[in-house]
Amino acid sequence: KGPDPSRLRFPPPTPAQRVAAGDMLLRTGDHDAAINQLSKVLELFRQGQMPEQAYADASFLIGEAYFRESEWDKAIKEFETFISFYPRHQIADLVQYRLAMSYYDQMKPVEQDQALTQRALDQFKRLVKDYPQSRYATDGLAKIDKCRERIAQKEVWVANYYFTQGNPSAARQRLELVLKEYPRTGVIPETLFLLAEVNFYEGKNAEAVELLRRLSVDYDFTEWGRRGKQRLNSSGLAGTKR
């Protein structure tokens, strides 16, 4: 007769096994169970019963579980804590990328507040600055461009609103900011057109004509470029010189 299974004592799982179990639950989509399993690793670490590597791995995986559940605030907290403690960890670049994406995936439509877009931009900049050799750096650069595009679009949207509300000076301030800070974005043609209209409104015809000429020449392939040319011709000032 063999030993009574109920009396058998198995050794406790190793730190690596505990983390692997949480990782497996995460991979199968059982995020709540993964968080529960991995949280035990963190607790054991606080009790001095778990190595720091296991703690770091569990910390990231908990953040990843929250990320996949779109629980952005909790994911951000985990990722920020990881980066603050382990900025040179072998997966620190991935954690930084996930942190940036936690903001990026929350970006609002153009007409709404773009604070989250700015935060995403800041975190992607940190990614490419601190981890330039990362496999995620290329996508980080692409996301930087998209964030800048969205912020520039919002500035133009606000400028257009100010102009339609009879506040050309506020509109000018926004439009000139776009030309200065976001010169490589796709909103430049629209910005030039609107700034020309602001100048016409304020009686600065020569400045308006110069902007429309630039628009019709440099961006003739765009709809705004074609509209700029039409506006220039209809103004009767096409031959005006400054």
What are these regions (language model features)?
Residues 1-242:
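Acidic, polar-rich low-complexity tracts and alpha-helical solenoid repeat scaffolds
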